[in-house]
Amino acid sequence: MAKVRTRFAPSPTGRMHVGNLRTALYEYLIAKHEGGDFILRIEDTDQERLVEGATEIIYRTIAKTGLIHDEGPDKDKGFGPYVQSERQATGIYLKYAKELVENGEAYYCFCTKERLETLKSAVGEEDGESKEITKYDKHCLHLSKEEVEANLAAGMPYVIRQNMPTEGTTSFTDAIYGTITVENSELDDMILIKSDGFPTYNFANVIDDHFMEITHVVRGNEYLSSTPKYTRLYKAFGWEEPVYIHCPLITNEEHQKLSKRSGHSSFEDLIEQGFVTEAIVNFIALLGWSSTTNEEIFSLEELVREFDYTHINKSPSVFDMNKLRWMNGEYIKRMDSEKYYEYALPQIKKVVTKDYDLKFIADLVKTRIETFLDIAEMIDFFDELPEYDIAMYTHKKMKTDSENSLKVLQDVLPRFEELTCYSVSSIESVLMGYIAENGIKNGQGLWPVRTAVSGKQSTPGGAYEIMSILGKEESLRRIRIAIDKLSSSL
């Protein structure tokens, strides 16, 4: 059996969409599961859509996610060039397009934009706008050899189109969807070489996949409709087709196609929203694939061992933000303290500017956050006591109200004034001693103090930890503010 070779072939048109990242991940996993090679190829044939700096984004993303390629523009192993514009300069695409013309499998088309406009027909709506398609009518197929040569000699702009049969059927096999057969009459004569001399995405893919000896091709199921055209190209050349693996659509929670407007459609969007790379990769692996085990948390190495592309689903995969947040939280909990602190510190510094123990604050929130952007809102009370309503002192479960909260604060204030060491254990000793002496429930003694020093309904850590971080002076100041608030309301 031939060595498994897969390729990730992105276009440098901006940030990497999660659908593209899933394709890269699946290509990587298929290759590595079988001990094969994972190739990076840059598809820049659509020159109008190129975005400056987008190639660097591709390199940065695959490096950060650990999807290290064995071959690519920076690692030529004899199958290069690995950038399509560089391959185009060698004349390879035009050479094979002309071979198809000679065999009657393709033809020159000289139709103007104006003529092509007349062939357009509406096919419904997409994103609120009417969608049109142009099905070519084979007009230029009927030009004589002399007419074609005269047009070429005159420098008339042209494209080269694939010549599809109008009768019969074409079948191909997909690893997920099985054998699919289409009527040839439904297939358009797609363009192979554009008027600028560049190949189309579809044609370049077939040529490059063949000469790079690609064995498995992963792509979104929106390409299922184009695959019969690829099949006919492979047959026309007498080449063996790769294994096709078409992945299900990724939708948002409303079951609509995940778009850039969602705000979390790209890898970089998710990083900016406080998600960690390992969690993103793990989550994206499960968008359409599931393990035979019930496990959901996988390292990249574990995914390589577990991944079996025959377990990819056909049905659309929902990008469930709640599940991603949960998974991210699990990864944060498992992070080693040094790496975690490196991620958490910039978020802590956004809201904590005073000389507090930031490492202690980071440790308090570690098991409570799902993304790093959750941190700021949880700890913003350290720098500045927020305005709060005294209704917060009334808590049915804790059996507290304004009156008994005021008494607790007035009673513990002198004890804290006398305390010199504001360690967690010292503060705990004072409060638990007071609770025991007065025969009250823990919540009755702790809730008023925590509320007073934080001004918040929920906090990372309790009264002991918060007061230890704030220190004596600030803790006492906040307790006195609370006493004044409660006294003036009664």
Swiss-Prot record:
An example Gene Ontology CC term for this record: cytosol
Catalytic activity: tRNA(Glu) + L-glutamate + ATP = L-glutamyl-tRNA(Glu) + AMP + diphosphate
Primary localization class, coarse: cytoplasm
Compartments in which it is found: Cytoplasm
'HIGH' region, short sequence motif: residues: 10-20
InterPro entries with a match to the protein in the record: aa-tRNA-synth_I_cd-bd (IPR045462), aa-tRNA-synth_I_codon-bd_sub2 (IPR020751), aa-tRNA-synth_I_CS (IPR001412), aa_tRNA-synth_I_cd-bd_sf (IPR008925), Glu-tRNA-ligase_bac/mito (IPR004527), Glu/Gln-tRNA-synth (IPR000924), Glu/Gln-tRNA-synth_Ib_cat-dom (IPR020058), GluQ/Sye (IPR049940)
Note on how the cofactor is bound: Binds 1 zinc ion per subunit.
Domain of life of the native organism: Bacteria
EC number per UniProt: 6.1.1.17
Subunit and partners: Monomer.
UniProt name for this protein: Glutamate--tRNA ligase
Originating organism: Lachnoclostridium phytofermentans (strain ATCC 700394 / DSM 18823 / ISDg) (Clostridium phytofermentans)
Name of encoding gene: gltX
